[in-house]
């Protein structure tokens, strides 16, 4: 209670309420739904954790390790009710690309150090409230990157389907190695792998649909379809064990998995080794954040909620650090498992807590059951999962809508396939930013005119509008800054050269959100040049905050013309009566 007698809110309770708002109103009914969702997610996660560890080039138990304590860390610091963190295909492939060239004995500790570094980068970004960095990675880049990575993942798993060895970080390197080793194909592994691909694909494609046709409720049918692969995995384990695939047919299997929870141990590497992991850690942190936040935002939108991107950075950062110190590798939010949890009725991060408990029980009691699981089955699981990540339709739509975005997406896609996953995302981000900057260097600045009998002004090069030779209006479709200020000077000079009768030039600033110091200097120079040519310079439709900044300078004191509230007001005061015969020679467009 404060001095006025009012009860002050408990700051500790307020902090808890802000971070774990989903605890308000939590009851047995919500818990039962979270429990069901957690069981279903665990059934999906057990084989996935083994498969993604295989994809990362690490022992299978590592996939289980990163599915326990990191989930607790995300629940403590993340903002999404529904996001399920853990091993994923894309991040596993990026980890594999990073550690593949390292000596066999250092890969595990290097992967753990990579997770800690990734977590530290995300954590620092969260503390600095740098969630806005997601805006620098365009959706076409993300879509193209995921499509390219999915294809690369599929190619990387061919070796397990054929039961051969192959290495490489690019499509051509992998395919070349696979081709060279095809004579060593293990026919039993090939049979197992192709059978598993066919079965998993048929289940994914048709099981839920068939159950609905048999009058099973749609939601229940979908859940059964998502849980069915674990039954297939169990069947293959039984077949492998009964026929002794490993001993009699030399089929690679998971083998003995150490039982028990992961030990807590901070990975120690030399400074040169840590420097070598820095760039991959930065790239992985970007991809992990963008991918996870996109999934979290989509699920939040479905439930009319919202997420805090800065808290997502903290949650992902904490979970990756925990993954590293428990012998794991980098993780992020899983789109598939999060969607399953949401569809199964999961409502809070209690789902993640329960999944962590179930995975811990798996690590302690169920690992002996998994030792006969063929690698070919895990590879089939990965391949079928990656089919859904390939989205050529989105790339096609992007190309049709925007050629610049299409070029960026295509370059990202090809870079992933030809250069590898790490350089692919960097190439996409850099190219997207370069094209954006290039677009602002020479912004669209058309001369505009008025639709007859209206107060609407449009591009004279595209519309049939009124124009006159006395008052010209140049519409600036971009903020003005140092990189495009000279272009504005050149554009004004061109208009002056082509308009010998002009006495007034209006700069229509509807789209101008900012004018920096360099652009202000250019405007002062333009004003001086026009004044010497007996032409007045005016502004219209200028935003208040831009106008306020101009008032701080003495530019307006020297301005030869005026600042008008609207373009129509400017033309009413400056323009002559319209000459209806003087229309721009263009077809009218609406």
Indicate residue ranges for each PLM-predicted region.
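Transmembrane helical cores of multi-pass ion-transport proteins
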Residues: 2-455, 468, 522, 554
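Intrinsically disordered or compositionally simple regulatory linkers and C-terminal tails
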Residues: 2-13, 574-590
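Generic hydrophobic alpha-helical segments
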Residues: 95, 178, 488-492, 570, ...
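Alpha-helical elements of the RecA-like P-loop NTPase motor core of helicases
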Residues: 232, 547-548, 572
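Short linear loop/turn motifs
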Residues: 314-315, 560-571
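C-terminal structured domain segments across diverse proteins
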Residues: 327, 354, 566, 570, ...
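The feature marks cytosolic C-terminal regulatory regions of anion transporters and related permeases
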Residues: 388-553, 557-558, 568, 578, ...
């Amino acid at each position: 209670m404060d001095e006025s007698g009012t009860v002050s809110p408990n700051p500790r309770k307020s902090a808890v309420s802000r971070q774990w708002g989903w605890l308000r109103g939590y009851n047995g009914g919500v818990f039962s739904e979270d429990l069901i969702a957690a069981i279903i997610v665990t059934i999906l996660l057990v084989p996935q954790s083994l498969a993604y560890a295989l994809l990362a080039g690490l022992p299978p138990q590592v996939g289980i390790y990163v599915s326990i304590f990191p989930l607790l860390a995300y629940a403590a610091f993340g903002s999404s009710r529904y996001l399920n963190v853990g091993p994923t295909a894309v991040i596993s492939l990026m980890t594999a690309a990073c550690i593949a060239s390292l000596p066999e004995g250092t890969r595990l500790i290097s992967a753990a150090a990579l997770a800690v570094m990734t977590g530290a980068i995300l954590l620092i970004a969260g503390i600095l409230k740098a969630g806005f960095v997601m805006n620098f990675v365009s959706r076409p880049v993300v879509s193209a990157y995921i499509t390219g990575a999915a294809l690369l993942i599929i190619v990387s798993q061919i070796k397990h389907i054929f039961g051969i060895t192959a290495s490489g970080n690019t499509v051509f390197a992998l395919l070349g190695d696979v081709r060279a080793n095809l004579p060593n194909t293990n026919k039993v592994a090939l049979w197992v792998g192709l059978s598993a691909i066919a079965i998993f694909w048929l289940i994914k494609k048709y099981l839920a649909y068939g159950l609905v046709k048999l009058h099973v409720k749609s939601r229940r049918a979908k859940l059964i379809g998502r849980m069915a692969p674990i039954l297939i995995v169990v069947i293959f384990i039984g077949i492998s064990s009964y026929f002794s695939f490993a001993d009699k047919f030399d089929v690679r299997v998971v083998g003995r998995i150490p039982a028990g929870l992961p030990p807590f141990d901070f990975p120690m590497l030399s400074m040169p080794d840590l420097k070598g992991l820095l760039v991959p850690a930065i790239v992985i942190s970007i991809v992990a954040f963008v991918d996870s936040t996109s999934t979290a935002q989509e699920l939040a939108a479905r439930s009319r909620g919202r997420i805090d991107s800065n808290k997502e950075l903290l949650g992902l950062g904490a979970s990756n650090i925990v993954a590293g110190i428990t012998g794991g590798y980098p993780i992020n939010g899983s789109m598939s498992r999060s969607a399953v949890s949401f569809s199964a009725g999961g409502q809070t991060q209690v789902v993640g807590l329960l999944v962590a408990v179930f995975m811990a029980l798996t690590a302690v009691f169920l690992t002996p059951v998994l030792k006969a699981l063929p690698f070919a089955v895990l590879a089939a699981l990965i391949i079928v999962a990656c089919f859904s990540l390939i989205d050529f339709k989105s790339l096609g739509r992007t190309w049709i809508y925007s050629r610049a975005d299409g070029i960026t997406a295509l370059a990202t896609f090809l870079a992933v396939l030809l250069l590898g996953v790490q350089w692919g995302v960097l190439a996409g981000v850099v190219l997207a930013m370069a094209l954006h900057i290039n677009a602002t260097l020479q912004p669209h600045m058309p001369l505009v005119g008025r639709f007859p009998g209206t107060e609407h002004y449009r591009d004279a090069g595209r519309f049939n509008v009124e124009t006159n030779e006395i008052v010209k209006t140049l519409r600036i479709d971009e903020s003005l800054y140092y990189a495009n200020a000279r272009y504005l000077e050149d554009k004004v000079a061109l208009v002056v050269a082509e308009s010998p009768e002009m006495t007034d030039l209006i700069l229509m600033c509807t789209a101008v959100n900012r004018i920096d110091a360099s652009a202000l200097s250019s405007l002062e120079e333009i004003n001086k040049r026009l004044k010497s040519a007996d032409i007045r310079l005016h502004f219209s439709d200028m935003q208040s905050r831009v106008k306020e900044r101009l008032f701080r300078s003495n530019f307006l004191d020297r301005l030869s013309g005026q600042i008008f509230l609207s373009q129509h007001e400017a033309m009413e005061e400056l323009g002559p009566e319209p000459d209806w015969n003087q229309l721009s020679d263009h077809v009218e467009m609406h």
